[in-house]
Amino acid sequence: MSAGGPCPAGAGGGPGGSSCPVGVSPGGVSMFRWLEVLEKEFDKAFVDVDLLLGEIDPDQADITYEGRQKMTSLSSCFAQLCHKAQTVSQINHKLEAQLVDLRSELTETQAEKVVLEKEVHEQLLQLHSTQLQLHAKTGQSVDSGAIKAKLSVHSVEDLERELEANKTEKVKEARLEAEVKLLRKENEALRRHIAVLQAEVYGARLAAKYLDKELAGRVQQIQLLGRDMKGPAHDKLWNQLEAEIHLHRHKTVIRACRGRNDLKRPMQAPPGHDQDSLKKSQGVGPIRKVLLLKEDHEGLGISITGGKEHGVPILISEIHPGQPADRCGGLHVGDAILAVNGVNLRDTKHKEAVTILSQQRGEIEFEVVYVAPEVDSDDENVEYEDESGHRYRLYLDELEGSGNSGASCKDSSGEMKMLQGYNKKAVRDAHENGDVGAAGESPLDDTAARAAHLHSLHQKKAY
């Protein structure tokens, strides 16, 4: 039994998987390593004590039980202590970084103040020298004392007050400018933090919805194992249930892809793919052939995700504006690429698909099929909106730094990692059964119609 110290505060479990704390100094890393060593020592001592309790005479089982209860409480306290220590450490290093920045800004401000004071002194000397030269040119023999004597005491005091007032006003302006800069930096940091939190919420909701569907499919498979059914009928129903799970995985990834796109440019379905026709085919459109013209110096202008190793087809996750894929107008986010120039991509892995797509030149023919995830969604209107109507997005536009060259390899770390941790068994079962298909929670007897279209489309092959 282990204390199982949790991840450092700020580590996320969103679509991008667990994220390490940003900006942790080397001291913070060593602190986490120290905690890890301490946790291992605690686990070792915990196991030793548990073994000692197991050697107590069975007649004294009450002592063993109470001892293990106390050990459980001790383990829980140690885990919470580790979590709090990690949180405090991260906050401490964040404050240290802010302190370094403030010290640097203070040093620069003090240096600027000294420079300005020297410049003012030099300007006054130059003004005094210029006045003396002016009087010398006009033939007047006047020294500095005579110039000062021309000013009345009242005028000197007024001049000093005016200079002091100007200085106060300029200090206020400089202070406001400095505060604005600090607030802008803080706002940018908070926006990035909110973007990460929104990504975690978005990914968690997608994963929870997918797991709910997959759990229903797995329960039906367990029920199928309890039936007295063998031979082709058993295999057919089993494959249909796998088809349910696979298509829902497909649709979940498409939702993640669409969540990354700009809300000002809503995703459009291909012509002829209205909601009524898509509902009849469970959100899966017909196979389309799209021609794309690409110059040698250009990329395709698309980003892809998925692959055989993830249990989903090669999906278009993003179309870059102004690139060949955008100009042709026939490709859409959510399209599954079945083939390109006659090369079958149904059974290819992600890296293989990237290589094949990057090698295409000139006139390229895509064989794609469109899948609409919202058709099968039971809460399509509010799935990613909160009570205020704000839609959860994966990333802010200014935080995205992806390139547009070729078939950009996003390696599904943004859209797929949230599924990899949950459905490795599902992917393994899918590869063994060699099947793809539809998603849903319908009873066993109702799954045939939902999976038939996908079976005919992909010849019962896993992507």
From Swiss-Prot:
Main location per the UniProt record: cytoplasm
Keyword annotations of the record: Acetylation, Cell projection, Coiled coil, Cytoplasm, Golgi apparatus, Membrane, Phosphoprotein, Protein transport, Synapse, Transport
Annotated InterPro entries: GOPC, PDZ, PDZ_sf
Membrane protein topology class: Peripheral membrane protein
Phenotype when the gene is knocked out: Male mice are infertile with globozoospermia. Spermatozoa display a default in acrosome formation and are unable to activate oocytes.
Coiled-coil segments on the chain, per record: 85-201
Tissue expression: Ubiquitously expressed (at protein level). Expressed in dorsal root glanglion (DRG), spinal cord and brain. Isoform 1 is preferentially expressed in whole brain (at protein level) and cerebellum. Expressed in spermatocytes and spermatides but not in Sertoli cells and spermatogonia.
Any one Gene Ontology BP term: spermatid nucleus differentiation
GO cellular component, one term: Golgi membrane
Phosphoserine: residues bearing it: 402, 405
Function: Plays a role in intracellular protein trafficking and degradation. May regulate CFTR chloride currents and acid-induced ASIC3 currents by modulating cell surface expression of both channels. May also regulate the intracellular trafficking of the ADR1B receptor. May play a role in autophagy. Together with MARCHF2 mediates the ubiquitination and lysosomal degradation of CFTR. Overexpression results in CFTR intracellular retention and degradation in the lysosomes.
Descriptive protein name: Golgi-associated PDZ and coiled-coil motif-containing protein
Gene behind the chain: Gopc
